[in-house]
Amino acid sequence: MSESLQDIALRMVTTGKGILAADESTASIKKRLESIGVESTPESRRDYREMLFRADAMRQSISGVILYDETLRQSAADGTPLRQLIVDAGSLIGIKVDTGTSPLPNFPGETITEGLDGLGKRIAEYHELGARFAKWRGVIAISNGLPTWGAVRSNAHALARYAALCQAGGIVPIVEP
């Protein structure tokens, strides 16, 4: 690997810059676009993302951009891969790798994050496509009697496996509990 995990992590936390979360799912971006009267199509989603990634502020303010799988594979109207726009702006490419949550069996009201199956292969593909960091979201319910130790332990185990797979694949893991 040409760049160490430490080098990537240091670039992510560059003073005065932040990480842009542009990893909204197709359903989430549909709501965002429809709220301003724009139909959600592959083209309108591409145009919205292209506008973000071509903004002058990208170079000055953004150290990395978390993408959704669709975005990582999309190209701008002129054919330039959107991921290249991010790199050209001096930012790192990140990717959301969890696939959402599902109810945690035997733990009413609690969830487990899905996406570990096949993650090693996906990490290798994402690295090949230019991703250098990833995000995994663990959702822990906090209320009267929650979280239970079993749910915390199950989610911590999933987060640890995700982080280990990322590191083995040359990608810095962001752990978002």
Predicted regions: what they are:
Residues L119-F133, N155-I171:
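Structured alpha-helical segments in the cores of large, soluble enzyme domains
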Residues V97, G138, P177:
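Short glycine-centered, acidic/aromatic-flanked micro-motifs in structured strand/loop junctions
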Residues M1-L129, I142:
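Alpha/beta catalytic barrel-like cores
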